[in-house]
């Protein structure tokens, strides 16, 4: 294993925390949700996690739309089941959401500097973006606008994107959270201005009686991500695995710990022996080895810090709920893990 490529960073201002988007709670009905909580392991730390089998993206998925998901920073939200949402009414939903955004803009709410009131929303089904056949189909939402003073015939540009997903969801949990009138798409990915996010979220809450919550990622879940993603055989975007640790001192400092992909892969191969699942003990052992190696070089106990970011060849994730998908090959597997976190984050 190579020595870490980075040491302790310079102090930085930590006073500005990320603002949380707060949506209006429309009083989501409790039908079926209490029983779901009683019979499913919500918020319990798992002792093992199943490794989703590699499944290529369906040919029904538009490659251009999949490309829109890659290499962008997405903010994560969890969403309660939507009441009376229909895949057959997407055009009508697009019309209503467009009207809602334009109405909010006319009230003086800023959407984006340099755009006209001519804003429109589109809803696109992504039926192939699923890990199993029984997973609900994903929905891509885009908000488009013409730049101010643009030439005649200029194309609209995308100013905001959002995607509802439910990939590799636990079948028993999914059965409990869905019905003839409830659709469970618990993971919501957002790329765009916070003002537009609030407008879209508010409209969905009023239209489908659902509620949104920020989806932070705990240090423990980041550790699971690092272990599970290290085991994937990436072929298209191979980079060093990097960990960012937050040091609980003032002024605030971060520690960056980068490891060659072959080194961490070899370490994980010596630890992980199963084919279908990853054990919590294996995750613990991986980080014990990393901590020991780092202490040998810098005499710093990383166990006294907080893991806040993980970057691998497959994806990167930050504790404040920011994610980048870096591999089309393993997009479904990453979405599957995030779907699990989103379901566990739903408040009842």
UniProtKB/Swiss-Prot annotation:
InterPro entries (alphabetical): CENP-L
Location in or out of the cell: Nucleus; Chromosome, Centromere
Keywords: Centromere, Chromosome, Nucleus
Disulfide bridge map: none
Gene Ontology cellular-component terms listed: chromosome, centromeric region; nucleus
Main location: nucleus
A Pfam family this chain is assigned to: CENP-L
Family assignment from sequence similarity: Belongs to the CENP-L/IML3 family.
PANTHER family, A to Z: CENTROMERE PROTEIN L
Role noted for this protein: Probable component of a centromeric complex involved in assembly of kinetochore proteins, mitotic progression and chromosome segregation.
UniProt name for this protein: Centromere protein L
Species name: Xenopus tropicalis
Gene that encodes the chain: cenpl
